[in-house]
């Protein structure tokens, strides 16, 4: 009921609210925008400062109630803006912050439930301000009911203001995300799967919402960011507990997808996207390094173990916005080096892999019109075939007269072919080299 009243108050036309509306000057609009940003930053920094420093000696139950009071204060600010000032921007900011702070409240209740369920076996963070142990079951139950009630009411009001068109989708996603956040599970082998599932669920919702132009405005972006907050809280919380190989891989995969693909939906800043691209690239490489560290003993590491790094760089070169040619060039150099060491050490399947990789590099060079992968691919193919030169020599020595006859026939046929098609061969060679010169 309260949320509906807030909606009705906020969507009233400005002409009905103010009988004689006045036009706000550009300077005033800028000042009010800066003031709103300043106020939001002050609220967030103050809350973070309190969590980190100001509540070390406060009992866990009181910490929750202080945070709850701050959330209610933000909602009260939204009501004042909506009913008293008849102003929408401030109300959106207050209720948006209130919805975001509720995820923090959910994480606190989750810490209480986990500490009670696990008892002395609970894995507690090293920081006292993150420990919520020794809270009575009755108080935990009350906190859980209050948090659940506020989660629905505040989220309903917030998403109604920010993106009323997609209220059901946002509310449903928020409830599921916070429900997973409250689970009393900290197992290093289970949490990564929960994080991965929640991430892809939120990402699917995010992609659906992004297709609506209204959700690309500031209000829509804020609503989309709020539903993702439980995921980032869960990731941050998992880093405070014993890590695992699965967690490292899952977080790295999320970083790759977010930095290479998803961040483009939020910003067009060249600097941010450039930095994010390198973070995503390093995360992709870190995935393979983590797999090697987990499953391969250092004494069994060969040069071929690092071939997937070249594959990763080449695959990313088709998705990144900056230095795509550099990615392919580095990938080609790595491939050449690995093929060289594999062939010189006469590793099993080295010539076959060298020929196969060389063909792929050659095709890529033709597709992207680049010299490095094309020439590198030709070198790999030639090196792979030269590896079998020893077998050709052995064949020749075992039956020299047959080999000599076959070689003589091949030489005569080659001479006849060159003589009959001399002009075509020269013309096509000239076209070939001119085309190669025009490539990057």
State where each predicted segment sits:
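Alpha-helical multi-pass membrane segments and their bilayer interfacial helix-loop junctions
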Residues: 1-440
């Amino acid at each position: 009921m309260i949320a509906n009243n807030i909606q009705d108050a906020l969507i009233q036309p400005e002409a009905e609210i103010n009988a004689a509306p006045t036009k706000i000057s550009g300077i005033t609009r800028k000042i009010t925008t800066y003031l709103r940003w300043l106020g939001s930053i002050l609220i967030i920094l103050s809350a973070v400062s309190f969590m980190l420093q100001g509540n070390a000696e406060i009992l866990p139950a009181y910490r929750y109630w202080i945070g709850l009071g701050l959330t209610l204060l933000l909602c009260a600010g939204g009501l004042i803006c909506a009913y008293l000032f008849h102003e929408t921007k401030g109300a959106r900011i207050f209720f948006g912050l209130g919805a975001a702070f509720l995820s923090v409240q959910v994480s606190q209740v989750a810490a209480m439930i986990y500490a009670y369920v696990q008892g002395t076996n609970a894995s507690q963070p090293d920081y006292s301000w993150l420990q919520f142990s020794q809270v009575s079951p009755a108080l935990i139950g009350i906190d859980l009911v209050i948090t659940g009630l506020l989660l629905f009411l505040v989220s309903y009001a917030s998403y109604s203001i920010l993106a009323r068109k997609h209220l059901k989708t946002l509310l449903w996603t928020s409830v599921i995300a916070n429900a997973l956040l409250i689970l009393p599970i900290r197992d290093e082998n289970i949490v990564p799967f929960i994080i991965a599932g929640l991430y892809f669920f939120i990402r699917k919702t995010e992609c659906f919402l992004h297709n609506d132009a209204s959700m690309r405005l500031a209000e829509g972006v804020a609503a989309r960011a709020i539903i993702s907050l439980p995921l980032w809280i869960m990731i941050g919380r998992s880093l405070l507990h014993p890590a695992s190989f699965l967690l490292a891989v899952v977080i790295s995969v999320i970083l790759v997808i977010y930095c290479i693909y998803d961040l483009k939906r939020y910003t067009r800043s060249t600097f941010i996207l450039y930095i994010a691209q390198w973070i995503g690239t390093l995360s992709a490489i870190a995935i393979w390094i983590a797999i090697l560290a987990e499953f391969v003993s250092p004494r069994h590491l060969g040069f071929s173990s690092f071939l997937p790094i070249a594959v990763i760089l080449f695959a990313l070169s088709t998705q990144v916005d900056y230095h795509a040619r550099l990615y392919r060039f580095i990938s080609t150099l790595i491939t050449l080096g690995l093929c060289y060491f594999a062939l010189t050490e006469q590793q099993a399947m080295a010539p076959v892999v060298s020929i196969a990789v060389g063909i792929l590099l050659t095709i890529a060079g033709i597709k992207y019109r680049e010299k490095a992968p094309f020439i590198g691919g030709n070198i790999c193919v030639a090196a792979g075939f030269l590896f079998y030169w020893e077998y050709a020599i052995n064949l020749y020595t075992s039956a020299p007269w047959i080999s000599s006859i076959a070689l003589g026939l091949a030489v005569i046929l080659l001479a006849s072919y060159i003589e009959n098609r001399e002009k075509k061969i020269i013309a096509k060679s000239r076209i070939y080299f001119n085309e190669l010169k025009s490539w990057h």
